[in-house]
C-alpha cells in the first residue's frame, strides 16, 4: 500500500560500518579508543542505565543506528547540573539523540498522589534521584549548552506523549509542546525506528535538519505552515451557520422559469478532489494560548488529535504556539514483520554495561528472560497511552525470529534456569490479530476495535499464538514458558482453545487480567467490557484448570478514582470484592498521564469520547480532591482497619448506614477492632517481601500452614484478620511497564494506573454492564472490550 516507504534495512550503509559491531556501545573516551573511534556520529543521552537489551530504548535505537553504519555512543544518567557530563564523548558528527528513558520521568519520580518515590527500577541498585524532573527538557538544554551547533533529536515516550500542547498533572496546567520548551530541532514520536533512520541518513548526506519537515512520525517547529497543504480549521467547537433570512412572500419575481428563453448547455463533468486527502490536508488544532484557559476546548482538541492517529488516513496536525507553528506530521507507517525481525535480530549483549559491576538493575532482572513478540494495541482504553505511542495496528515478529531469541537467551543470559518469564508485549494475546479488511483498516477512525463490541472485521483467531506457544515449549533447554503480560480476556473467550493452551501450560499459579472496575459508569469512560465478559472467562479458566489438575487463580486489577467514578461506584466495587473474598494489599489511584483520553476527562470534566459542545456537554464526575481520592483508594482496601473510620463516615453521609455492622452483607464493622493491620499480619512493613501482594481469601486450602498460621482463620469475618488470606501475587509496575517486555524503550505508558489488584467474580451489587460476546448481529452474545496490560 505504501511502496514508497524505504524499509529500514535497505538504506545504503554509512562509511563507518568498517568499524564493525561493538561488544557494548561506548560510554567513555577509553571505550571509544579501544574501538578505534576518534569521534561518535550519534550520541544518545538517556535517563536510564545502559542495558544492552532489546527492551531498553537506548540499546535498540543504538544498535539500529550501528547497523546502518553509524558510530553510536551512550551517555546514561549524566550529572545534569552542568554541561560537563554531556561532553565526555566529544562532539557528535551528526546529532544528539535525547530520551528520558523507558518511562516518563515524572511518572518515574512521583506517585499518582504526587508523592516522591525513593526508588528507580531503571537505575543500578534501585537508587532514586538519578535523573531530573522533565528529563528530556533538561538533557536537551544541557546538550545545547555543550555544543550549540549540533542538532538535537528528541524521542522516547516522554517526548512522544508531549508532542502537542498537553495537560500536565504535576503542575495542574496546560503546557506547551515539549519540542518548543526543550528547544530541540525535531521530535520523533512513537517507537520511531523508521523516522530515526531517515533523519540520520539525510543528515549524513549533508541535508540541514531545518529542511526535514516532511518525515512521518516527526514534529517540527516552523515559522509558517507548508504552502501546498489545505488546512481544515478545528479551532472552534460550536461553529455558527449562516443566519436564515426568510424570503418575502409578496415580492414580485422579475425572472422565473416561464420567462427564461436561454437553454442551459451541458457542462463538462469534473471530479472534485477529496477534501480529506491525507497527503495534502492538515488539521489545525486550537492554539496553546486558547487551551490554557478553556477546558472544554481542550477536550475538543484531544478528541480531534485521537481521530487523526491512523497512519494511512490520519492527517498532519498544526497548532499555534505564540508566533510559531507546531507541525506534527502523519503517524509513521508500522514496521513490517521483516523489519521487526531485523530490529530484534540485531546483536545485543543482553546484559547491563560492565561499568555497573555487580549492581542490580531491577528493570533488567524483571525482563532479562522475556521476549517481546509484538507492538501496538487496538484496545483503546482511555487511561492508556499505548495506542497514542505505538499505534493501533499490531506489528508482529515472525515465529522464527522469536524462537531464535529464545535460543539466544538460553545461550547468553547468565544463570538462565530454563524459565522464560514472558512472551508478550503491550498485551499477551494480540499477536497477529488485526483487521481482516485492509481497505477498512486504512480508513478506520474508531478509537477501539473492541469497544463497545468487537468489530465484525476484526480477526480474533488465536491460532498463531497457540502455535507460537507450542513451538516455544519445544525449544531444547526451555523448561517453562510463563505468560506474564496481561491477557485481553474479551479476545480470549473468542478462542476457547487459546484459553485451554494458556491455562494448561503457561500460568504459574496466578494469571493477571484487568477488569479495572465493576460498574457501568466507570467502565464506559474507560472503554472496558462489562463483568459478564469477565465471568465467562473465569468459567473457562476454572474449567481448563480443573481439567489440567491444577489449582490456579485469577488476579484482577482495578483502578480507583478514574474519571466517571462516583463514591457509590467504589462502594459497589468494594462489596463485590468482599463477596468474592478479595483483599487488596496494594492499590492504585488513576494517574493522569499526558495525551490519554482519560487525562482529558480529568482536566476538562467532560467526555472527549463523543462530540464536545459548549452547550450541554456530557459532564463526567471526577475525583480530584485529595479526600475523595483517598476514600476511593480506601474502599479498595475495605478490610484494613485503618480505613474503617473514613469509610464509616462516607457510608453514613451517603445514606448507607446499613452497610456498617457485623452482618454478612455489611462492608465494615460497627466499631474499630484491636486486630493487627494488614502489614502487621503479613509480618512486613512498607518495604516487606509481600508489599505488592493481592490476596484471595478463603479459597486456597492449606495456605494458612504455608504462612505459619496454625489458628486456621479465627476471628470475626472481614474485620481485618488476615489469617485466611492467600498467596501473594505479583503487582503491576508503574508507568510504562518493563515487566511486560515492551519494545525498545518505548514501554508504553500504560502508566502506573494499574497497581491495584483485585477481584474475581461478578456479584449482584451495582449496575454493571453484562455480556460476553460479539454484537448480536454476529450471532453471539453481547460483549464489550477491555484493555489488557
Curated annotation (Swiss-Prot):
The UniProt note on the cofactor reads as follows: Binds 1 [4Fe-4S] cluster. The cluster is coordinated with 3 cysteines and an exchangeable S-adenosyl-L-methionine.
Residue numbers binding [4Fe-4S] cluster: 377, 381, 384
Alphabetized UniProt keyword annotations:
4Fe-4S, Iron, Iron-sulfur, Metal-binding, S-adenosyl-L-methionine
Which Pfam families does this entry report, sorted A to Z? Answer: DUF3362, Radical_SAM, Radical_SAM_N
Point to the regions of Polar residues compositional bias. Answer: 716-726, 733-763, 778-789
Residue ranges under compositional bias (Basic residues)?
683-698
Query: Which residue ranges are recorded for the region named Disordered?
Result: 669-789
GO MF terms held by the record: 4 iron, 4 sulfur cluster binding; catalytic activity; iron ion binding
Q: Does the record's keyword annotation contain Cell wall biogenesis/degradation?
A: no
Q: What InterPro entries has UniProt attached to this entry?
A: Elp3/MiaA/NifB-like_rSAM, Methylthiotransferase_CS, rSAM, rSAM_horseshoe, UPF0313, UPF0313_C, UPF0313_N
Please give the SUPFAM superfamilies that the UniProt record associates with this protein: Radical SAM enzymes (SSF102114)
Tell me which residues make up the Radical SAM core domain. Answer: 363-642
Cofactor(s) demanded:
[4Fe-4S] cluster
Report the NCBIfam families cross-referenced here: SAM_YgiQ (TIGR03904)
For this chain, the family text in UniProt reads: Belongs to the UPF0313 family.
**Protein name (Swiss-Prot/TrEMBL):** UPF0313 protein VC_1711
Name the species this protein comes from.
Answer: Vibrio cholerae serotype O1 (strain ATCC 39315 / El Tor Inaba N16961)
Its taxonomic path starts at: Bacteria, Pseudomonadati, Pseudomonadota, Gammaproteobacteria, Vibrionales
Amino acid at each position: 500500500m505504501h511502496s514508497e516507504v524505504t524499509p529500514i534495512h535497505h538504506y545504503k550503509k554509512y562509511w563507518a560500518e568498517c568499524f564493525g559491531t561493538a561488544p557494548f556501545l561506548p560510554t567513555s573516551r577509553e571505550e571509544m579508543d579501544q574501538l578505534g573511534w576518534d569521534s561518535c556520529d550519534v550520541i544518545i543521552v538517556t535517563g536510564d542505565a545502559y542495558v544492552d537489551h532489546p527492551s531498553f530504548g537506548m540499546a535498540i535505537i543504538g544498535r539500529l543506528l550501528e547497523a546502518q553504519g553509524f558510530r553510536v555512543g551512550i551517555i546514561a544518567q549524566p550529572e545534569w547540573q552542568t554541561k560537563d557530563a554531556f561532553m565526555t564523548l566529544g562532539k557528535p558528527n551528526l546529532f544528539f539523540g535525547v530520551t528520558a528513558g523507558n518511562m516518563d520521568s515524572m511518572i518515574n519520580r512521583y506517585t499518582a498522589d504526587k508523592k516522591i518515590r525513593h526508588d528507580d527500577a531503571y537505575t543500578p541498585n534501585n537508587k532514586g534521584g538519578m535523573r531530573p524532573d522533565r528529563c528530556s527538557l533538561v538533557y536537551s538544554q544541557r546538550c545545547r549548552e555543550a555544543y550549540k551547533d549540533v542538532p538535537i533529536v528528541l524521542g522516547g515516550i516522554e517526548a512522544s506523549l508531549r508532542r502537542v500542547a498537553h495537560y500536565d498533572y504535576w503542575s495542574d496546567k496546560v503546557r506547551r509542546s515539549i519540542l518548543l520548551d526543550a528547544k530541540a530541532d525535531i521530535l520523533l514520536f512513537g517507537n520511531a525506528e523508521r523516522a530515526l533512520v531517515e533523519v540520520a541518513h539525510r543528515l549524513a548526506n549533508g541535508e540541514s535538519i531545518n529542511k526535514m519537515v516532511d518525515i512521518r512520525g516527526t514534529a517540527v517547529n516552523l515559522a509558517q505552515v507548508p504552502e501546498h497543504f489545505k488546512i481544515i480549521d478545528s479551532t472552534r467547537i460550536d461553529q455558527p451557520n449562516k443566519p436564515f433570512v426568510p424570503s418575502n412572500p409578496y415580492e414580485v419575481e422579475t425572472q422565473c422559469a416561464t420567462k427564461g428563453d436561454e437553454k442551459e448547455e451541458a457542462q463538462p463533468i469534473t471530479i472534485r478532489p477529496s477534501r480529506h486527502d491525507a497527503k495534502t490536508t492538515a488539521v489545525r488544532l486550537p492554539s496553546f494560548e486558547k487551551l490554557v484557559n478553556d477546558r472544554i476546548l481542550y477536550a475538543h482538541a484531544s478528541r480531534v488529535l485521537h481521530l487523526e492517529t491512523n497512519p494511512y488516513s490520519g492527517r498532519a496536525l498544526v497548532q499555534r504556539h505564540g508566533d510559531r507553528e507546531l507541525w506534527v506530521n502523519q503517524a509513521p507507517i508500522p514496521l513490517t514483520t521483516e523489519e521487526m525481525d531485523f530490529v530484534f535480530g540485531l546483536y545485543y549483549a543482553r546484559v547491563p554495561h560492565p561499568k555497573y559491576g555487580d549492581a542490580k538493575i531491577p528493570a533488567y532482572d524483571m525482563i532479562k528472560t522475556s521476549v517481546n513478540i509484538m507492538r501496538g494495541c487496538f484496545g483503546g482504553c482511555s487511561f492508556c497511552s499505548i495506542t497514542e505511542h505505538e499505534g493501533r495496528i499490531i506489528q508482529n515478529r515472525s515465529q522464527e525470529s522469536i524462537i531464535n531469541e529464545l535460543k539466544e537467551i538460553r545461550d547468553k543470559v547468565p544463570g538462565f534456569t530454563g524459565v522464560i518469564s514472558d512472551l508478550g508485549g503491550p498485551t499477551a494475546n494480540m499477536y497477529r490479530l488485526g483487521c481482516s479488511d485492509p481497505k477498512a483498516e486504512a480508513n478506520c477512525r474508531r478509537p477501539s476495535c473492541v469497544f463497545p463490541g468487537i468489530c465484525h472485521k476484526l480477526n480474533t483467531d488465536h491460532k498463531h499464538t497457540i502455535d507460537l506457544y507450542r513451538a516455544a515449549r519445544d525449544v531444547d533447554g526451555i523448561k517453562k514458558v510463563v505468560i506474564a503480560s496481561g491477557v485481553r480476556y474479551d479476545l480470549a473467550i473468542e478462542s476457547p482453545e487459546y484459553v485451554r493452551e494458556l491455562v494448561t501450560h503457561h500460568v504459574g499459579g496466578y494469571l493477571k487480567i484487568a477488569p479495572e472496575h465493576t460498574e457501568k459508569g466507570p467502565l464506559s469512560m474507560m472503554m472496558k467490557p462489562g463483568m459478564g465478559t469477565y465471568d465467562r472467562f473465569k468459567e473457562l479458566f476454572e474449567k481448563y484448570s480443573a481439567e489440567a489438575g491444577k489449582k490456579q487463580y485469577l488476579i484482577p486489577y482495578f483502578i480507583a478514582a478514574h474519571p466517571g467514578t462516583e463514591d457509590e461506584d467504589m462502594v459497589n466495587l468494594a462489596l463485590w470484592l468482599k463477596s468474592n473474598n478479595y483483599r487488596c494489599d496494594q492499590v492504585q489511584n488513576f494517574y493522569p498521564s499526558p495525551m490519554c483520553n482519560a487525562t482529558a476527562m480529568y482536566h476538562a470534566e467532560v467526555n472527549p469520547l463523543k462530540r464536545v459542545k459548549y452547550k450541554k456537554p456530557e459532564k463526567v464526575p471526577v475525583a480530584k480532591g485529595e479526600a475523595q481520592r483517598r476514600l476511593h483508594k480506601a474502599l479498595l482496601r475495605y478490610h484494613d482497619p485503618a480505613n474503617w473510620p473514613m469509610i464509616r463516615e462516607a457510608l453514613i453521609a451517603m445514606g448507607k448506614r446499613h452497610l456498617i455492622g457485623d452482618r454478612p452483607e455489611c462492608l465494615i464493622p460497627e466499631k474499630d477492632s484491636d486486630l493487627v493491620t494488614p502489614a502487621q499480619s503479613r509480618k512486613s512493613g512498607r518495604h516487606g517481601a509481600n508489599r505488592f501482594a493481592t490476596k484471595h481469601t478463603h479459597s486456597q486450602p492449606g495456605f494458612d500452614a504455608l504462612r505459619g498460621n496454625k489458628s486456621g482463620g479465627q476471628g470475626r469475618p472481614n474485620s481485618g484478620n488476615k489469617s485466611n488470606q492467600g498467596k501473594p501475587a505479583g503487582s503491576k509496575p508503574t508507568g510504562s511497564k518493563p515487566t511486560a517486555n515492551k519494545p525498545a524503550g518505548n514501554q508504553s505508558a500504560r502508566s502506573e494506573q494499574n497497581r491495584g489488584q483485585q477481584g474475581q467474580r461478578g456479584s449482584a451489587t451495582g449496575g454493571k454492564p453484562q455480556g460476553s460476546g460479539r454484537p448480536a448481529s454476529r450471532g453471539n452474545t453481547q460483549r464489550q472490550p477491555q484493555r489488557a496490560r
